[in-house]
Amino acid sequence: MRLIEQHWYRPRGWLTALLAPLEGLFALLAAARRQAFRRGWKTSGRLPVPVVVIGNINVGGVGKTPLTLALLRDFAARGVKVGVISRGYGGKAPAPTEVGPDSDPALVGDEPLLLAAAGAPVVVGRDRVAAGRHLLARHPDVELILSDDGLQHYRLARDLEIVVLDGSRGLGSGRLLPNGPLREPPSRLAAVDAVVVNGEGAQLPLPDGLPRFAMTLRPGACHALDDASRARDAAGFAGRKVAALAGIGHPERFFDTLAGQGIAVEQRLSFPDHHAFVPGDIPADADAVIVTSKDAVKLARVIHDAAQRARLWVLPVQATLAPDLCEWILARLKTKHGR
Protein backbone atom coordinates (compact mmCIF):
# COMPACT_ATOMS: atom_id res chain seq x y z
CA MET A 1 0.00 0.00 0.00
CA ARG A 2 1.38 3.42 -0.95
CA LEU A 3 2.22 5.98 1.73
CA ILE A 4 -0.68 8.22 0.72
CA GLU A 5 -3.16 5.34 1.02
CA GLN A 6 -1.75 4.41 4.42
CA HIS A 7 -2.28 8.03 5.45
CA TRP A 8 -5.94 7.87 4.44
CA TYR A 9 -6.64 5.16 6.99
CA ARG A 10 -3.89 5.83 9.54
CA PRO A 11 -3.40 9.62 9.38
CA ARG A 12 0.01 11.16 9.92
CA GLY A 13 -0.15 14.60 11.51
CA TRP A 14 2.58 16.20 9.43
CA LEU A 15 1.08 14.92 6.18
CA THR A 16 -2.41 16.07 7.19
CA ALA A 17 -1.10 19.61 7.65
CA LEU A 18 0.89 19.49 4.43
CA LEU A 19 -2.08 18.38 2.33
CA ALA A 20 -4.72 20.56 4.02
CA PRO A 21 -4.58 23.37 1.41
CA LEU A 22 -5.06 20.90 -1.44
CA GLU A 23 -7.90 19.23 0.44
CA GLY A 24 -9.56 22.61 0.91
CA LEU A 25 -9.28 23.37 -2.80
CA PHE A 26 -10.71 19.96 -3.70
CA ALA A 27 -13.62 20.48 -1.28
CA LEU A 28 -14.36 23.89 -2.78
CA LEU A 29 -14.37 22.61 -6.35
CA ALA A 30 -16.48 19.53 -5.51
CA ALA A 31 -19.06 21.61 -3.63
CA ALA A 32 -19.20 24.24 -6.37
CA ARG A 33 -19.81 21.65 -9.04
CA ARG A 34 -22.64 19.98 -7.14
CA GLN A 35 -24.26 23.32 -6.31
CA ALA A 36 -24.08 24.36 -9.96
CA PHE A 37 -26.38 21.46 -10.87
CA ARG A 38 -28.60 21.78 -7.79
CA ARG A 39 -29.27 25.47 -8.46
CA GLY A 40 -29.81 24.99 -12.18
CA TRP A 41 -26.72 26.86 -13.33
CA LYS A 42 -25.80 23.66 -15.13
CA THR A 43 -28.46 21.32 -16.47
CA SER A 44 -28.78 17.57 -16.06
CA GLY A 45 -29.97 15.30 -18.84
CA ARG A 46 -32.88 12.99 -18.05
CA LEU A 47 -33.38 9.66 -19.78
CA PRO A 48 -36.88 8.34 -20.59
CA VAL A 49 -36.50 5.36 -18.23
CA PRO A 50 -35.62 5.31 -14.50
CA VAL A 51 -31.93 5.59 -13.65
CA VAL A 52 -30.37 4.09 -10.53
CA VAL A 53 -26.82 5.19 -9.73
CA ILE A 54 -24.58 2.68 -7.96
CA GLY A 55 -21.70 4.79 -6.66
CA ASN A 56 -19.40 5.64 -3.80
CA ILE A 57 -18.02 8.68 -2.05
CA ASN A 58 -14.60 7.16 -1.49
CA VAL A 59 -11.95 5.92 -3.88
CA GLY A 60 -10.75 2.36 -4.16
CA GLY A 61 -12.58 -0.91 -4.55
CA VAL A 62 -15.72 -1.08 -2.44
CA GLY A 63 -17.69 -3.72 -4.36
CA LYS A 64 -19.80 -1.76 -6.86
CA THR A 65 -19.32 -4.26 -9.67
CA PRO A 66 -20.32 -7.38 -7.64
CA LEU A 67 -23.35 -5.41 -6.44
CA THR A 68 -24.31 -4.45 -9.99
CA LEU A 69 -23.93 -8.08 -11.08
CA ALA A 70 -26.17 -9.20 -8.22
CA LEU A 71 -28.82 -6.65 -9.19
CA LEU A 72 -28.68 -7.74 -12.83
CA ARG A 73 -29.25 -11.32 -11.69
CA ASP A 74 -32.14 -10.39 -9.40
CA PHE A 75 -33.84 -8.07 -11.90
CA ALA A 76 -33.58 -10.73 -14.61
CA ALA A 77 -35.24 -13.24 -12.28
CA ARG A 78 -38.16 -10.80 -12.00
CA GLY A 79 -38.40 -10.29 -15.74
CA VAL A 80 -37.16 -6.68 -15.63
CA LYS A 81 -35.05 -5.69 -18.64
CA VAL A 82 -32.05 -3.72 -17.35
CA GLY A 83 -29.21 -1.95 -19.13
CA VAL A 84 -25.94 -0.65 -17.71
CA ILE A 85 -23.99 2.51 -18.46
CA SER A 86 -20.47 3.10 -17.23
CA ARG A 87 -17.56 5.44 -17.64
CA GLY A 88 -15.42 2.47 -18.58
CA TYR A 89 -12.52 3.39 -16.32
CA GLY A 90 -9.26 2.15 -17.76
CA GLY A 91 -10.75 2.28 -21.26
CA LYS A 92 -10.29 4.85 -24.00
CA ALA A 93 -13.58 4.81 -25.91
CA PRO A 94 -13.93 8.31 -27.43
CA ALA A 95 -17.72 8.05 -27.87
CA PRO A 96 -20.54 5.90 -26.47
CA THR A 97 -19.59 2.31 -27.24
CA GLU A 98 -21.58 -0.86 -26.68
CA VAL A 99 -19.61 -3.60 -24.96
CA GLY A 100 -19.64 -7.06 -26.52
CA PRO A 101 -17.89 -10.36 -25.80
CA ASP A 102 -15.06 -9.48 -28.16
CA SER A 103 -14.59 -5.87 -26.99
CA ASP A 104 -11.08 -4.73 -26.20
CA PRO A 105 -10.69 -3.91 -22.47
CA ALA A 106 -8.18 -1.23 -23.44
CA LEU A 107 -11.05 0.51 -25.23
CA VAL A 108 -14.06 -0.19 -22.99
CA GLY A 109 -12.52 -0.98 -19.59
CA ASP A 110 -12.44 -4.16 -17.53
CA GLU A 111 -15.54 -3.88 -15.34
CA PRO A 112 -17.94 -3.27 -18.27
CA LEU A 113 -16.65 -6.46 -19.90
CA LEU A 114 -17.48 -8.39 -16.75
CA LEU A 115 -20.96 -6.84 -16.63
CA ALA A 116 -21.62 -7.55 -20.31
CA ALA A 117 -20.70 -11.20 -19.75
CA ALA A 118 -23.74 -11.39 -17.46
CA GLY A 119 -25.96 -10.85 -20.50
CA ALA A 120 -27.06 -7.25 -19.97
CA PRO A 121 -26.62 -4.55 -22.62
CA VAL A 122 -23.72 -2.34 -21.51
CA VAL A 123 -22.62 0.98 -23.01
CA VAL A 124 -19.56 2.94 -21.90
CA GLY A 125 -18.83 6.61 -22.40
CA ARG A 126 -17.49 9.65 -20.61
CA ASP A 127 -20.86 11.34 -21.03
CA ARG A 128 -23.27 9.07 -19.18
CA VAL A 129 -26.32 10.83 -20.68
CA ALA A 130 -25.08 10.17 -24.20
CA ALA A 131 -24.24 6.59 -23.19
CA GLY A 132 -27.78 6.08 -21.89
CA ARG A 133 -29.35 7.44 -25.06
CA HIS A 134 -27.09 5.23 -27.16
CA LEU A 135 -28.12 2.19 -25.12
CA LEU A 136 -31.84 2.93 -25.40
CA ALA A 137 -31.58 3.53 -29.14
CA ARG A 138 -30.09 0.06 -29.58
CA HIS A 139 -32.19 -1.65 -26.90
CA PRO A 140 -35.59 0.08 -26.75
CA ASP A 141 -36.97 -2.72 -24.56
CA VAL A 142 -34.77 -1.69 -21.62
CA GLU A 143 -36.97 -0.61 -18.70
CA LEU A 144 -34.35 0.47 -16.18
CA ILE A 145 -30.77 1.71 -16.35
CA LEU A 146 -28.10 1.08 -13.74
CA SER A 147 -25.22 3.55 -13.77
CA ASP A 148 -22.13 1.69 -12.58
CA ASP A 149 -20.38 4.49 -10.70
CA GLY A 150 -21.29 8.06 -11.66
CA LEU A 151 -22.47 9.38 -8.29
CA GLN A 152 -20.48 12.55 -8.96
CA HIS A 153 -21.52 12.70 -12.63
CA TYR A 154 -24.29 15.21 -11.96
CA ARG A 155 -24.98 15.81 -15.62
CA LEU A 156 -26.92 12.53 -15.48
CA ALA A 157 -30.29 12.98 -13.78
CA ARG A 158 -31.07 10.05 -11.52
CA ASP A 159 -34.09 8.59 -9.77
CA LEU A 160 -32.22 6.78 -7.00
CA GLU A 161 -28.71 7.01 -5.58
CA ILE A 162 -27.25 3.96 -3.86
CA VAL A 163 -23.83 4.30 -2.24
CA VAL A 164 -21.59 1.31 -1.57
CA LEU A 165 -19.35 1.44 1.50
CA ASP A 166 -16.51 -0.86 2.51
CA GLY A 167 -17.52 -2.33 5.86
CA SER A 168 -13.94 -3.02 6.90
CA ARG A 169 -12.34 0.30 5.95
CA GLY A 170 -15.35 2.58 6.40
CA LEU A 171 -14.68 6.20 5.46
CA GLY A 172 -11.07 6.11 6.56
CA SER A 173 -9.99 9.40 8.10
CA GLY A 174 -13.22 11.01 6.90
CA ARG A 175 -11.24 13.60 4.96
CA LEU A 176 -11.36 14.55 1.30
CA LEU A 177 -8.75 13.88 -1.35
CA PRO A 178 -5.79 14.04 -1.23
CA ASN A 179 -5.83 14.06 2.59
CA GLY A 180 -8.27 11.17 2.81
CA PRO A 181 -10.07 8.67 0.58
CA LEU A 182 -13.27 10.68 0.08
CA ARG A 183 -14.50 12.28 -3.13
CA GLU A 184 -17.28 14.02 -1.21
CA PRO A 185 -17.76 14.72 2.52
CA PRO A 186 -19.60 12.23 4.78
CA SER A 187 -22.52 14.68 4.87
CA ARG A 188 -23.24 13.69 1.24
CA LEU A 189 -24.73 10.45 2.58
CA ALA A 190 -27.68 12.42 3.95
CA ALA A 191 -28.82 13.08 0.37
CA VAL A 192 -28.61 9.53 -1.02
CA ASP A 193 -31.46 7.03 -1.04
CA ALA A 194 -29.69 4.01 0.47
CA VAL A 195 -26.32 2.57 1.39
CA VAL A 196 -24.99 -0.93 0.84
CA VAL A 197 -22.30 -1.99 3.30
CA ASN A 198 -19.88 -4.55 1.92
CA GLY A 199 -18.73 -6.69 4.84
CA GLU A 200 -18.40 -5.73 8.48
CA GLY A 201 -15.93 -4.17 10.86
CA ALA A 202 -15.95 -0.39 10.79
CA GLN A 203 -18.27 1.91 12.72
CA LEU A 204 -20.02 3.89 10.01
CA PRO A 205 -21.48 7.34 10.82
CA LEU A 206 -24.67 6.90 8.79
CA PRO A 207 -27.55 9.39 8.92
CA ASP A 208 -30.57 8.32 10.97
CA GLY A 209 -33.27 6.67 8.91
CA LEU A 210 -31.06 6.00 5.89
CA PRO A 211 -31.99 2.58 4.44
CA ARG A 212 -29.07 0.20 4.89
CA PHE A 213 -28.42 -3.11 3.14
CA ALA A 214 -25.77 -5.66 4.04
CA MET A 215 -23.74 -7.21 1.23
CA THR A 216 -21.68 -10.35 1.59
CA LEU A 217 -19.26 -11.55 -1.08
CA ARG A 218 -19.27 -15.33 -1.18
CA PRO A 219 -16.41 -16.97 -3.10
CA GLY A 220 -16.95 -19.99 -5.28
CA ALA A 221 -14.46 -22.67 -6.25
CA CYS A 222 -11.57 -21.55 -8.42
CA HIS A 223 -11.97 -22.47 -12.06
CA ALA A 224 -9.59 -22.65 -15.00
CA LEU A 225 -9.29 -19.51 -17.11
CA ASP A 226 -10.34 -21.35 -20.28
CA ASP A 227 -12.88 -23.73 -18.75
CA ALA A 228 -15.28 -22.55 -16.05
CA SER A 229 -16.49 -26.14 -15.60
CA ARG A 230 -13.03 -27.27 -14.47
CA ALA A 231 -13.00 -26.35 -10.79
CA ARG A 232 -10.39 -26.77 -8.09
CA ASP A 233 -10.78 -26.36 -4.33
CA ALA A 234 -8.08 -25.66 -1.75
CA ALA A 235 -6.99 -29.31 -1.68
CA GLY A 236 -6.33 -29.12 -5.41
CA PHE A 237 -3.68 -26.46 -4.83
CA ALA A 238 -1.95 -28.30 -1.98
CA GLY A 239 1.72 -28.99 -2.62
CA ARG A 240 1.86 -26.48 -5.46
CA LYS A 241 3.57 -23.11 -5.58
CA VAL A 242 0.63 -20.72 -5.75
CA ALA A 243 0.73 -17.03 -6.61
CA ALA A 244 -2.16 -14.58 -6.40
CA LEU A 245 -2.38 -11.59 -8.73
CA ALA A 246 -4.75 -8.63 -8.47
CA GLY A 247 -5.15 -5.32 -10.28
CA ILE A 248 -8.13 -4.04 -8.29
CA GLY A 249 -8.88 -1.20 -5.90
CA HIS A 250 -8.57 -3.19 -2.67
CA PRO A 251 -6.40 -6.27 -3.37
CA GLU A 252 -6.08 -7.16 0.32
CA ARG A 253 -9.70 -8.31 0.34
CA PHE A 254 -8.94 -10.74 -2.50
CA PHE A 255 -5.85 -12.10 -0.76
CA ASP A 256 -7.75 -12.47 2.52
CA THR A 257 -10.52 -14.34 0.72
CA LEU A 258 -8.02 -16.85 -0.64
CA ALA A 259 -6.59 -17.35 2.84
CA GLY A 260 -10.11 -17.85 4.16
CA GLN A 261 -10.59 -20.56 1.55
CA GLY A 262 -7.57 -22.38 2.93
CA ILE A 263 -5.42 -21.73 -0.15
CA ALA A 264 -1.76 -21.25 0.76
CA VAL A 265 -0.44 -18.40 -1.38
CA GLU A 266 3.33 -18.00 -1.50
CA GLN A 267 3.44 -14.88 -3.66
CA ARG A 268 1.04 -11.92 -3.65
CA LEU A 269 1.27 -9.51 -6.57
CA SER A 270 -0.63 -6.21 -6.46
CA PHE A 271 -1.03 -3.94 -9.46
CA PRO A 272 -2.86 -0.61 -9.78
CA ASP A 273 -6.60 -0.71 -10.36
CA HIS A 274 -7.44 -1.13 -14.08
CA HIS A 275 -3.86 -2.24 -14.77
CA ALA A 276 -3.12 -3.14 -18.40
CA PHE A 277 -1.59 -6.58 -17.98
CA VAL A 278 1.20 -7.99 -20.13
CA PRO A 279 2.49 -11.58 -20.23
CA GLY A 280 5.50 -10.59 -18.14
CA ASP A 281 3.22 -9.85 -15.18
CA ILE A 282 2.58 -13.58 -14.72
CA PRO A 283 5.20 -15.08 -12.36
CA ALA A 284 7.11 -17.72 -14.29
CA ASP A 285 7.98 -19.85 -11.27
CA ALA A 286 4.42 -20.39 -9.98
CA ASP A 287 2.58 -23.65 -10.61
CA ALA A 288 -0.75 -21.86 -10.36
CA VAL A 289 -1.70 -18.18 -10.50
CA ILE A 290 -5.09 -17.21 -9.05
CA VAL A 291 -6.73 -14.00 -10.28
CA THR A 292 -9.99 -12.09 -9.85
CA SER A 293 -12.82 -12.31 -12.36
CA LYS A 294 -12.25 -8.66 -13.21
CA ASP A 295 -8.60 -9.27 -14.08
CA ALA A 296 -9.39 -12.53 -15.87
CA VAL A 297 -11.31 -10.74 -18.65
CA LYS A 298 -8.15 -8.77 -19.47
CA LEU A 299 -5.65 -11.59 -19.01
CA ALA A 300 -7.66 -13.83 -21.34
CA ARG A 301 -6.98 -11.33 -24.13
CA VAL A 302 -3.25 -10.80 -23.60
CA ILE A 303 -1.99 -14.24 -22.52
CA HIS A 304 -1.75 -16.39 -25.64
CA ASP A 305 0.79 -19.01 -24.62
CA ALA A 306 -1.09 -22.25 -23.88
CA ALA A 307 1.20 -23.30 -21.03
CA GLN A 308 0.90 -19.90 -19.38
CA ARG A 309 -2.90 -19.88 -19.74
CA ALA A 310 -3.10 -23.35 -18.19
CA ARG A 311 -1.59 -21.97 -14.97
CA LEU A 312 -4.25 -19.27 -14.59
CA TRP A 313 -7.17 -19.86 -12.23
CA VAL A 314 -10.07 -17.53 -11.47
CA LEU A 315 -11.73 -17.01 -8.09
CA PRO A 316 -15.37 -15.99 -8.69
CA VAL A 317 -17.39 -14.18 -6.03
CA GLN A 318 -21.12 -13.63 -5.80
CA ALA A 319 -22.81 -10.90 -3.79
CA THR A 320 -25.78 -11.64 -1.57
CA LEU A 321 -27.89 -8.84 -0.11
CA ALA A 322 -30.09 -8.53 2.94
CA PRO A 323 -32.78 -7.38 2.89
CA ASP A 324 -33.83 -7.64 -0.77
CA LEU A 325 -32.39 -4.55 -2.48
CA CYS A 326 -33.95 -5.35 -5.85
CA GLU A 327 -37.43 -5.46 -4.34
CA TRP A 328 -36.76 -2.21 -2.48
CA ILE A 329 -35.66 -0.44 -5.69
CA LEU A 330 -38.77 -1.54 -7.55
CA ALA A 331 -41.00 -0.40 -4.68
CA ARG A 332 -39.30 3.01 -4.48
CA LEU A 333 -39.58 3.53 -8.22
CA LYS A 334 -43.23 2.54 -8.13
CA THR A 335 -43.86 5.06 -5.35
CA LYS A 336 -41.97 7.74 -7.25
CA HIS A 337 -43.38 7.12 -10.72
CA GLY A 338 -46.52 5.10 -10.08
CA ARG A 339 -45.27 2.20 -12.17
Swiss-Prot record:
Entry keywords, A to Z: ATP-binding, Kinase, Lipid A biosynthesis, Lipid biosynthesis, Lipid metabolism, Nucleotide-binding, Transferase
Residues that coordinate or bind ATP: 58-65
SUPFAM superfamilies per UniProt: P-loop containing nucleoside triphosphate hydrolases
Catalysed transformations (reactions): a lipid A disaccharide + ATP = a lipid IVA + ADP + H(+)
Catalytic activity, EC: 2.7.1.130
Pfam family, one: LpxK
NCBIfam families xref list: lpxK
Protein name: Tetraacyldisaccharide 4'-kinase
Native source organism of the sequence: Chromobacterium violaceum (strain ATCC 12472 / DSM 30191 / JCM 1249 / CCUG 213 / NBRC 12614 / NCIMB 9131 / NCTC 9757 / MK)
Lineage: Bacteria, Pseudomonadati, Pseudomonadota, Betaproteobacteria, Neisseriales
Gene: lpxK
